A protein has these predicted regions:
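HKD-type phospholipase D/PLD-like phosphodiesterase module
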Residues: 1-19, 24-160, 176, 180, ...
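Short alpha-helical basic/polar micro-motif
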Residues: 163
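Acidic/polar loop patches that form or flank catalytic/metal-binding clefts of enzymes
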Residues: 166-167
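Long, repeat-rich segments with strong aromatic
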Residues: 170-173
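Charge-patterned, long linear interaction tracts outside catalytic cores
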Residues: 271-283
């Protein structure tokens, strides 16, 4: 199988039958995924769950993770709540027996998200280590640390030539990725950025958006908070925002991969076409 499209529903179903489950997320609210993990632990499966103890500016996520830890521990699961100062963890991944699953959002099932299944033993091994031990790593297929995941996205953009490039992110700041987008646009290559809508962009985000627009990048606000890039016949999919990876965030546990698989590239193209069409141009 190697890489293939999956879904949150598929992962929930797999958790219910797996004997060994390693699961990681930025936060885990009440819902079908939490219920599936609790049920698997109660049924005797080995379940190990890793969550960020203190999601950034997200008190609801902090409470959700504490409650999830309480319920999962009571059901017999192993739970790790990681403090961001020591182990920044933004990964959304699961390993069920011999298959790894990677999600670009937080297993919400409330809207579009991209879930990738991977049964390559090398990939499965490093994903399992990233989930269970918060160990950032990379192989030829997957990067599991933010700096390397975003570096691969930058390389995709830089290698696109005159082909149209579309990138979607929830948040954005000045970084090598925005520099690559600006350079393309200055040279006349069609370049679009879809960025999540918010009431209050940070000063750094406003500065990045102004610079991108000034150099000719088409900015669309809205989308679905996915993390995607499309450049010709190749695509990048991941969990990391286009905010750069300096300092502590360089080793943040994330994921990102570049693919030319026709089904995956087609899914990314469909998602980006949907989000470009449903968003508004930034004033």
């Amino acid at each position: 199988m190697a890489l293939s499209l999956s879904s949150v529903a598929d992962v929930i179903a797999r958790i219910s039958t797996a004997r060994d489950v390693a699961f990681g997320s930025y936060f885990l609210p009440e819902g079908p995924m939490r219920d599936a993990l609790v049920g698997a632990a109660r049924s005797g499966a080995h379940v190990a769950v890793t969550l960020q103890a203190d999601p950034y500016r997200n008190p609801h996520g902090r409470r959700d993770n504490r409650e999830a830890a309480r319920l999962l521990t009571a059901a017999g699961a192993e739970v790790s709540l990681l403090r961001s100062a020591r182990a920044p963890f933004h990964l959304k991944a699961a390993v069920c027996d011999g298959t790894a699953y990677l999600d670009d959002r937080n297993w919400t099932a409330r809207g579009p998200e991209m879930v990738i299944a991977d049964d390559d033993p090398s990939d499965v091994s490093i994903v399992r280590d990233a989930v269970r031990e918060a160990r950032p790593a990379a192989d030829a297929t997957i990067a599991l640390r933010k700096d390397e995941a975003l570096r691969r996205e930058v390389l995709l953009v830089e290698a696109a030539g005159d082909a149209p490039v579309v990138v979607e992110t929830e948040r954005v700041r000045d970084s090598p990725l925005t520099a690559a987008l600006r350079a393309r646009a200055r040279g006349g290559a069609p370049t679009t950025l879809v960025v999540g809508r918010t009431r209050h962009h940070s000063r750094a985000e406003r500065r990045a958006l102004v610079a991108l627009a000034r150099d000719g990048v088409v900015i669309r606000e809205g989308g679905t908070n996915q993390k995607l890039a499309l450049a010709g016949g190749a695509a990048w999919i991941g969990s990391g925002n286009a905010t750069g990876a300096g300092g502590r965030s360089a080793r943040q546990v994330e994921w990102g991969l570049v693919t030319r698989d026709a089904a995956l590239v087609g899914a990314v193209r469909t998602a980006l076409e949907r989000d470009v069409a449903s968003t508004r141009a930034r004033d």
